[in-house]
């Protein structure tokens, strides 16, 4: 699977992202880029989560997936990665937003 460059002028650029203040001029994506235009909710939190935080994240994420809501998170340790893992275990779709390139 090769990374895809999505420029702001491209029809593939996520529509909702166009309306934020200072949207990125380009995105690098890997995987199914169609889900970038589907409804999703960001689930983020502490890297040093508590057991309660983990339990609530799993419950919240599982419920969102049951309603076909995509999970968006940063892929960091803690709550972010718990959200992604829970989403995938429940057959959901997930988007990981990385602060740097795909090779890092």
List each model region and its residues.
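Phosphate/pyrophosphate-binding betaalpha-module
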Residues: 61, 68-72, 76, 80-104
């Amino acid at each position: 699977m090769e990374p895809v460059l999505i420029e702001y002028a491209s029809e593939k650029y996520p529509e909702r992202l166009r309306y934020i203040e200072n949207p990125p001029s380009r995105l690098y994506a890997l995987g199914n880029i169609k889900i970038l235009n589907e409804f999703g909710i960001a689930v983020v939190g502490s890297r040093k989560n508590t057991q309660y935080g983990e339990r609530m994240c799993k419950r919240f994420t599982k419920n969102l997936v049951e309603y076909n809501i995509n999970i968006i998170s940063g892929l960091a340790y803690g709550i972010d990665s718990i959200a992604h893992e829970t989403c995938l275990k429940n057959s959901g779709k997930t988007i990981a937003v990385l602060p740097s390139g795909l090779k890092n």
